[in-house]
Amino acid sequence: MQGATNGSPWWAALTVWGVVNAVNLLQAAGFLSRIVTGSSSMNHALGRLIGALAIPALVAMIAFVRSQAGWLYWTGPAVFAVFVVFMLFVDYIRPVAFRSPVRHGILVPYLVLFFGAILLMGLPMFRLNRTLWLVTAATTAFLLVSMGIAVRHGVA
């Protein structure tokens, strides 16, 4: 593997790649656990792990900024960090029921930040390593399918 690509540290790109794929798989497991258990308790626990992934994402973001990598490299981790702060607040610190009944003022920004972070963290790998990007595309598809199944079962 390379030491750097397009002025960005390769280790930071691999870190973000690991974060985005871990988020996809953890959230997919969370959706599927709701179907199996009929509860969101497992999903709630997995959310803490997703939140912890903001730490390596922020370390990678700082490396991208310090190496003067293009905005596309650091934007995904930055949006993910904003999502994690928002998630921690509405799901853990001051819990708000916004999924059911739907509270659009919370749900829309929550979903935009979440899926925006997934897109923006995955996008740079398209240029850097197509094989790794395909892994991200596959885990994202798995996330979307598991979300669709959870919606179909009324537990999303």
Predicted features and spans:
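Short, strongly hydrophobic alpha-helical membrane anchors
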Residues: 1-12
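N-terminal signal-anchor/start-transfer transmembrane helix
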Residues: 10-38, 143
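Structural signature of hydrophobic alpha-helical transmembrane segments
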Residues: 11-24, 71-82, 137
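C-terminal ends of transmembrane helices
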Residues: 28-41, 88-97, 148-155
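Membrane-helix boundary elements
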Residues: 40-74
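Small-residue-rich segments of transmembrane alpha-helices in multi-pass membrane proteins
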Residues: 48-60, 103-119
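Membrane-helix boundary connector in multi-pass membrane proteins
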Residues: 92-105, 116-135, 152
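Small-residue-rich transmembrane alpha-helices that serve as helix-helix interface/gating elements
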Residues: 131-147
